[in-house]
Amino acid sequence: FFFNHTTAYEIASCLVGSEMCIRDRTGGGVFISNWIKPFGTIFINSLKLIAIPLILASLIKGVSDLKDISKLSSMGGITITTYLMTTVIAVSVGLLLVNIIKPGDSISEKTRTELIQAYDSDAEKKRTAAEENKNSGPLQPLVDLVPSNFVAAASDNKNMLQVIFFSILFGISMILIPSKKAKPIKDFFDSFNEVILKIIDLIMMFAPYGVFGLLAALIVEAPNADLLKSLLMYSLTLLLGLALMIVIYLLIVKLITGRNPISFLKAILPAQLVAFSTSSSAATLPVTMDRVKNHLNVEKEVSSFVLPIGATINMDGTAVYQAVAAVFIAQTFGLDLSFTAQLGIISTATLASIGAAAVPSAGIIVLVIVLAQAGIPEAGLALIFAVDRPLDMCRTVVNITGDATVSTIVSKFQKNQN
């Protein structure tokens, strides 16, 4: 399996950006700020631009596509419930590890001050908002969930949960009306979703240049080896979280289905390799379905129902990533996230992961949503771009392993009912 061209270009841009900045941090600083950093800013803005349309399109389409669950209520209920439970577990694992290891605290106060100065206008606003959030009541997150004006909510990335709430409500309402009346608007959102995915493809074509600009500016504006140390700690924290999710899957497989965990891993290994090489749950779906049906002996009616839904709404690897990355960036900027704010990360990451497109690097766009909702500077994305692509490949392995796990659970329940 080989990297695609975009992957190679992103890695090359990271290396060239680092080398360029290490060679000339002083004389080239003004040049980089004026002529290179803007490309990174454009890339970040394009990610923020597509975040709300992605949530609207993918969630409304995803929920309305579950119409068939009314015919398969038993299988559908088990499938959705299990997927949501594993996603909540994934976010919780990420939050637990990042709060214990604290990778963002590995940088010195000097480096933190330089970062805050570099992104001062954004970070100070976020810090003030975080302090205000600490003084809110226990039910304030529930109040904030329901928008008083959807147009106003959609105009500000800070109100992502309100957009998610409206999108899910809209999709459920489409299911509840006669299909003949729902068809025109469903066709619209199906097409709208395809357009959004194509826009994401176009944005990610620009990714190597954006990553280059962000990395070059980051190293020039905060030139400290602490950043490399903190990135290493962040990467290790995330990889540990992903490894723990694999262990949790194996325990679930053993305890609920009685299967041998080693045999389970051997059966889905080819699908994991494809997932690692493509970074796409959707591209891996045919291989996953083949391995689950022919090597895990899951009935075709179960695998053909559970796995396509999983490729859309089950992004456990992405969920671990959202939690670790969001808190890591907050720690790096010296933001103290309250318990309520971290609960908000669980709900936002869970719901946003459902709306995540099963395409490479969709997690970055979802992370924009989580950061905005939690009041964390989106500019902090520059901190993790350098290592995101290889970690994205690992996240996808966890995503499809979770899909295979849930399919075996649903198969077990179906057999017990029969």
Q: Which sequence ranges carry the predicted segments?
A:
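Signature of multi-pass transmembrane helix bundles
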Residues: 19, 25-28, 32-33, 44-47, ...
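Membrane-water interface of transmembrane alpha-helices in multipass transporters/channels
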Residues: 28-35, 73, 224-233, 257-269, ...
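Membrane-embedded helical hairpins/re-entrant loop segments and their flanking transmembrane helices
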Residues: 252-310, 329-338
